Regions:
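Short, flexible beta-strand-to-coil junctions
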Residues: 1, 11, 62, 240-249
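Enriched but not universal
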Residues: 1-59, 83-89, 96, 116, ...
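Short, intrinsically disordered, charge-balanced linker/junction segments flanking boundaries
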Residues: 15, 37, 69, 154-160, ...
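Glycine-rich strand-loop-strand elements at beta-sheet edges
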Residues: 34-36, 41-50, 61-114, 128-133, ...
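Bulky hydrophobic/aromatic "packing anchor" residues in well-ordered structure
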Residues: 42, 81, 112, 122, ...
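Periodic beta-strand elements of RCC1/NHL beta-propellers and select beta-solenoids
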Residues: 59-66, 118-124, 240-243
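Core domains of carbohydrate- and sulfate-ester-processing enzymes
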Residues: 129-171
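Acidic, glycine-rich loop-and-strand cores that form catalytic or ligand-binding grooves
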Residues: 159-249
């Protein structure tokens, strides 16, 4: 099909949306045509085979980072590349689509590549910090863990890199219940721990909330769950939210 192709790629429903230009291509776990747009949705890694070169726009989301353990920070969301850039896909070329996944460490990245060269890289989110450990850097940054000492701020959140990413929140002091910071999300930083009136063992510390994600329909109004069998109502169309932090009391 010629026209505007869109590639949507994420580990809940990944894919490629083909863009302006006379592109002929196949691939994806699901394809849908909505108006002048043809959407290639990748829910798992696979090939995107171009038989007639042209342009496409890509929505790609990296895998989410894992939470830490023991008074830990929340895991962060992966980077969201969101259809803004028009990419050129070469004639008679097979592109490898690798869908990033959540892990117990940093999330793995989502990529499109051919001949060993990456056309798209969406970074995975950073892992949340353990007790007395900073959150990992990533797409969005992981939340910092609690500690290392009483009456002071805890460990810092990881920094963010790439499009639609935010840093992780700071963890609390080394006081019960040892609360961590939230992981960064696509549209909001991870929140710092919340504490009571004073930094004492009796303070009611609360782990920081994860940063807010982004609605797919805010990127493209066609990306409603009703239009794609790969989408589910359960995710409410919100992607790349950061994870909330835990505590240890």
């Amino acid at each position: 099909m010629t026209g505007i192709h869109q590639l949507l790629m994420t580990n809940f429903a990944g894919g490629i949306a083909t863009g302006e230009g006379q592109l002929n291509a196949s691939g994806g776990n699901e394809t849908q045509t909505i108006g002048i747009y043809k959407y290639h949705v990748f829910t798992s890694s696979g090939d995107f085979t171009v038989t007639g070169g042209g342009n496409a726009r890509v929505l790609a989301i990296g895998g989410g980072g894992g939470g830490g353990h023991n008074a830990s920070g929340g895991g962060a969301a992966g980077e969201v590349d969101d259809f803004q850039e028009l990419l050129v896909f070469d004639n008679s070329t097979t592109y490898k689509v690798s869908i990033g996944t959540g892990t117990t460490n940093n999330g793995s990245q989502t990529t499109i590549s051919a001949g060993g060269t990456n056309l798209v890289v969406s970074l995975g989110g950073g892992r949340g910090g353990n007790f007395s450990t900073a959150g990992n850097n990533g797409g969005s940054g992981g939340g910092g863990g609690a500690g290392p000492s009483a009456h002071t701020s805890g460990s810092s959140g990881g920094s963010a890199s790439g499009d639609n990413t935010n840093a992780g929140g700071t963890g609390g002091p080394n006081d019960s219940p040892f609360a961590g910071g939230g992981g960064g999300g696509a549209t909001q930083v991870g929140q710092n721990f919340a504490n009571g009136a004073s930094h004492t063992a009796d303070s009611e510390q609360i782990g920081g909330a994860g940063g807010e994600g982004i609605a797919l329909t805010a990127i493209d109004t066609n990306l409603a769950f009703a239009n794609f069998s790969s989408f589910t109502e359960a995710n409410s169309g919100i992607v790349a939210s950061g994870g909330g932090a835990g505590s240890n009391r």
